[in-house]
Amino acid sequence: MSTQPTKTSSTKLRIFKWLFIISTLVAIAIPITRLLMHLYGKIDEKMYARIFMSYRVNSADSFMINGRYKAIKAKAYPTSEERNKFNSIAQEGDKAVLLKYPYPEHFSLEPEWHYTLCDDVFYNLWKIRVNVCEYYKNNKQEDIAGLVTPPKEAKVDRFFRQDPKISDDDYKKLFTGTDENGKGWSSAAVQFIDILLNLINKPEECKLKDGKLNEKFQKDLESLVSQLGYSTEDMKNIANEIPNFFIQFGKAFPTVIHSTVYSRFYYFFLFLTINGNFDFSEVEKTDGMKIEEFNKQTMKVMASVFAQIFAKVYEESYNYEIKDAGFMDKVRAYFSVSDNIDNVKDQTKNINTVKEVLIKNKELLSK
């Protein structure tokens, strides 16, 4: 009796097994290679802005906008002084900031461990957040054509929106009475506005080159962070970390602390520009679209506006690309981080509006 069919079947099975093993190894090797390239590979600094914008628009910005806090059972995790303090502010009593005010909250870690990234400086920003939400609550949003009106029982009239009609007095009230000992976000508002205006008007004086920031820009950032309330001892470490903050974002590989700091400044940027009349025409309204969804989309637009201002710190603009790339350049590009900017919409018009709004608001907050 012939055994040829059995041999053929056995050979096919071995070939299939080897193909499966090889394809599995390749599937594992590619992401590992990309991670190693990400960690240790050299990325052209001229590509930082492009990589940064790709990272923000295609993934990172959504985490700042879609995050919502849910109460954590007090006995579910070991207690500590830091966790107890966080819980008392975030979720306990009538003034539970993260529960009573459904404003977006960015979680670089799981919500259960969010407290490890919070300190008194971050808690101070929440005071402005409360003022903003209370303002929304007392000043209902007008209907937007084609959108569903929010329910009357809503605790807050939708978690975010621009309000060009806010009075100067109401705008100032968002920031007053939130700082202690002359330190905090409100006290640092004018400094932050100056930094944003410098990035918009004089980006050549704010550049990151060869791993270092322009000396004056570095000092301006140190002064801003100090004004937020960090101690002299803290500032020694923070000052050294500031250039790395921008470098890691240029590589799309920030630490959880970097990401948390970025989102705090983004929220602060939103609060400071709440009275701007921005262009949200890129947000497509659909039948039955709820107001909260529309506002979420406008928040994404503002995230892109903020990111494009932030990206001015880098040597080249975000639409820079390496011309006449050689074979090895293409290999490095394949295994490196994404630089796909197809979803990035130019925000020059809105950045010009930011400039006008901040000049006005600087004067208001300086009085």
Curated annotation (Swiss-Prot):
Query: What keywords does the record list, in alphabetical order?
Result: Cell adhesion, Cytoplasm, Signal
Q: Give the signal sequence positions.
A: 1-29
Tell whether Signal is among the UniProt keywords: yes
Keyword Cytoplasm annotated: yes
Q: Name one GO cellular component term.
A: polar tube
GO process annotations (BP): cell adhesion
Q: Looking at the record's lineage, which domain of life comes first?
A: Eukaryota
Q: Where in the cell is it found?
A: Cytoplasm; Spore wall; Spore polar tube
Q: Tell me where it mainly resides.
A: cytoplasm
Which segments does the entry list as coiled coil? none
Record's function text: Involved in adherence of spores to the host cell surface and in infection efficiency.
Complexes and interactors = Interacts with SWP7.
Name this protein carries in UniProt = Spore wall protein 9
Per UniProt, what is the name of the gene that codes for the protein in this document?
Answer: SWP9
